[in-house]
Amino acid sequence: MNDNTSKKLETLVSDGGTVNVYIWDMDETLILLRSLLNGTYAESFNGSKDVKRGLEIGKMWEKHILKICDDCFFYEQIEDCNEPFLDSLRQYDDGKDLSRYDFKQDDFSTPTDDLNKRKLAYRHRAVADKYEKGLPPFIVSETMSVLDELYSVTDEYTDRWLSSARDFLVQCSSVKEESGDGISAIDKSSQDIHILVTSGALIPSLVKCLLFRLDTFLKHENVYSSIDVGKLQCFKWIKERFNHPKFRFCAIGDGWEECAAAQALQWPFVKIDLQPDSSHRFPGITPKTVSYYFAAVYGNSDADTSKE
């Protein structure tokens, strides 16, 4: 952790409060997609949900995700070059002005040497820039309308899973300041930071954040892909990055890997359950629910008692 990051952390805790760091899984936690495609979401309702309809919705999402990945985020070029986070190759980026850079004509190939690592770093920087600007600059209005309708249809089919998960983020995060470090863009009154650690590839995961309206809360610096390194390694990076006694961590997901990683670091873990009668799903789980998990490991804080 460099001096600048250390100062940012000190700023966040300058009022003496604690900072809660939520480490989220994506599929079947903040969003539903895999369980729509394989039918497990609908099947959990024992016949009251149309499995075929869920599959149709999932396939529509897949189509849009892959198209935006390829058309706007260089995925055809870098699909086989997955990195755990966008800044992983920053040391190779010389800061070149990319406004007129021709990504189609730079002879990019597998980044086994410094030159191609620099070219991949350029692409990552361009992806980060597009991500922070959101969808409207590179998606035509007709497509935006289609995506808005698909979101509404999905939210209705899943009994408000998507909007409820987003409401959770709204309740405990209020982004007021733009920041390039993924830390100081959090309203200090909330003292919460949200980080995504997904088993999906990095570029499609960033696109999912955009399409499922999560990018307001998940800056590109806070999105990690664990495919090649595992969730425990990602969790360790996060712990090192936010290394301060006032920071508290909690992992939230539906899988065994994030559970094991959280246990290894002695973090609380909230298990998401698809079953309709579970309170550990969306709608259902709230910041107050998670505050009990924080308290069980770290003890009570003013932030816990203020959760509603």
List each language-model region with its residue ranges.
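HAD-like aspartate-dependent phosphatase fold
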Residues: M1-V21, M26, L30-E308
